[in-house]
Amino acid sequence: MKVFEYDNGNEINPKRSKNWGDIISYPLVKTISQSKKIELTNDRVNGKLIVVGSVLQHLSEGDLVWGGGAINQNHISARPKKVFAVRGPLTRNELTIKGIDCPRVYGDPALLMPYITDYKRTSPKYKYGLIPHYVDENELEVENLKKQGVKIIDICAGLHEFIEDIMDVEFILSSSLHGLIASDAWGIPNARVNITNKLYGGHFKFIDYCLSVNRKIDYGYQLLNTTTIGDLSKIRYNDKISFNAERLINSAPWLDNQYKHLFY
């Protein structure tokens, strides 16, 4: 079984190939399933497994979906072979509109990362950490907070490097969805922020995720190039989610009698 990971790197921005949410599907599936038949693919081949990310625009008819999400409305590219779980109810709605069967099993599999790693929070060195989406990383709003002692966390630092960085802060601000999801996974208080508002798909994936974990819809706090540490202290930080990890894991395709032969 080939597990799909979207490669957004290019000659100008090669490090985007390491965007955290795009590089965790393969290790998640390989570790949780214990399958020896798992392969990684960055290609839009038919018959792949879609797991983490807003990647349902890359669907083919033979694909399986376990946790993936839509980037926006009307972006489902094909009818997959079977859907086991999706990121949230907005994604499910996009599938059902097209007549595609989709169970009400929700959850971004990135929330399972603590189950396959050994990272523990001890004594954070920084009070605040900012995770800019990679389209936001060079903006004045980021530099402004960096000068005030906020730890700037690179979402493209690498699978383990990124986790180590978020372990080092008390409160997370993020314009990246997977910055928020990673924070939730390890129980780090977090808040969505907007920097440039250039994210493709707008609020869709954020709302989809909020609904999946029973969180009030959050459109984000707008950072300015004059934002102060005092302003950050007034933001409402999320600290809890409603997430049934066992239900998501039990919905996995390698546990389905019809599809387990693809994994073992």
Model-identified regions with their sequence ranges:
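Active-site anion-handling motifs in enzyme catalytic cores
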Residues: M1-Y264
